[in-house]
Amino acid sequence: EIKEINNLKKMFLIEPYSVINTRDGKWQKLKKQWNYLLKEDGSTREEEEFSKRRNTGIQKRNNEIPTEKQKQFMYNDKNISLFDPVISQLCYDWFCVKGGHVIDCCAGDTRKGNVIAHLGGTFTGIELRKEQVEHNNIKAENGAKWICDNGENILNHINEKSADMLLSCPPYFNLEVYSELENDISNSQNYDIFIN
């Protein structure tokens, strides 16, 4: 049985069980390696500029901060979730053909796309927020690109049957608000609006 487990580790990098232990030492080591390689903290270019003000001691509720910046700060200050790069690696390695094209209709940050590009695949991500798309394309690895649009329009940006995998993480209701854009479902006022 131990030999069988070791073979699974060799074949799959992490044992492919129903529940994956992300606190495991090997997982954490891989995650650190990816984090070092990707150098991505989930911010946008605008947030990076805003963080300079934050580091000088300006607080969230300071009246000197313009209203739109207060909202952005409130939404993004240490409350952002980043897609685990090891999950990206495993999903690509386990379920996609080598050199495959992966699409994401709710792309968010650069992690999924850059992991897939680094592993030899290509990636097309659709993201609503213009500043996030600009930031992502600046930090993009060869083979990864982001397009500013609503994820519902993904077929306007890829050819039919051109993708080998859809890997996405749509927003949850009432957990994180990414923007106040009209077509951003993360800012839905109630669950009925969100689900429809």
Kindly label every feature range from the protein language model:
Residues 1-196:
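Class I S-adenosyl-L-methionine-dependent methyltransferase catalytic core
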